[in-house]
Amino acid sequence: MQPFEEAQQLVPGLAPKPDLVCLSHLRWDFVYQRPQHLMSRFARDRRVFFFEEPIFEDGPARLDVGERPGGVRVAVPRLPHGLPHGEVEAAQRDLLQGMLAGHGVSDYVLWYYTPMALGFSADLAPAAVVYDCMDELSLFRGAPPALLERERRLLEVADLVFTGGQSLYEAKRERHPSVHAFPSSIDAEHFGRARRPCPEPADQAAIPRPRLGYFGVIDERIDLDLLAAAAGARPDWQWVMIGPVVKIDPETLPRRSNLHYLGMKAYDELPSYLAGWDAALMPFARNESTRFISPTKTPEYLAGGRPVVSTPIRDVVRPYGELALVEIAEDPEAFVAAAERSMRRLGEGAPEREAWLAQVDEFLARGSWSRTFRHMSDLIDGAVLRRRGGPDATN
């Protein structure tokens, strides 16, 4: 039984909420991040369908729909190799409409993570349209040329625009009448496990200390030159990099005996790795692709009780750097110095650690994923009511 069905049984007469159909450029089974946190919570009180970008393979077009833990139904379009470009969106449209009909989805909120999905969904009739802009996708490597025009059209039809950070909010707020900033939130209980003794993962156990680690996607947003220089400056420190390598050639990764690439790990495994680090890293490059990012790992590292060092990414400097929760450093020399300083001041047993952790916890308490979900859900309820012409107290 679905979580929302259980809720309806517990509260007889509870009006069902519209289903939620999410159109995403990210894979559900890839890195666990904002879409998974939010959609798994929405699935507690409504049906959620997560429609991914297509996979091209041999055979006729089909849609694989499977349920994930928590109740989200993940739909993966599989399209034939060699399908002409002009027919790809038509095939996606057919598969999406077939899914809606086959699952009896008639009253639903349409939630976009990518404006490109407008090409096969513009003729639908949702109860409300949400654009959750978690990144400035047009600045990423390989962005489709049509993306900016699609975003312009999406902003015209959306009822609500959510942004993944303050910088994105400032970039979008003049382009739509209802833009709301929802920066990276946190499951503090999950990552708080790193503050307690954890069994060492087998592939990290033999790596000496001190360990400085990163988890997340390794792509054009990582400053590989900074990483190489910092690792070279401190050969006695071990630099642990966890996550998939995408959009860059793995051969371009710096290689040293104290640099360890451990690959992608499941979300449930991350606290165990984090617990074995002496500091956590965000060695982001300063380029167009990082201009608007609001890294989810910032609060995750902090919830795990690790001192954090980051390059001056705007949404990290403000608020984390300004509140002295995170050390900010721009070049390799400053990065190494900041890491050394933060480990000395804030590491296990350090004199300032307890006061810093208290400040961290006070800050993180205001930004849980559950709190973000509730606020978003209230805004969506209001948008649905407005479309239906009913009373709305949610402004």
Question: Where are the model-predicted features located?
Answer:
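N-terminal subdomain of nucleotide-sugar transferases
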Residues: 1-59, 231-234
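Carbohydrate-associated surface elements
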Residues: 167, 185-194
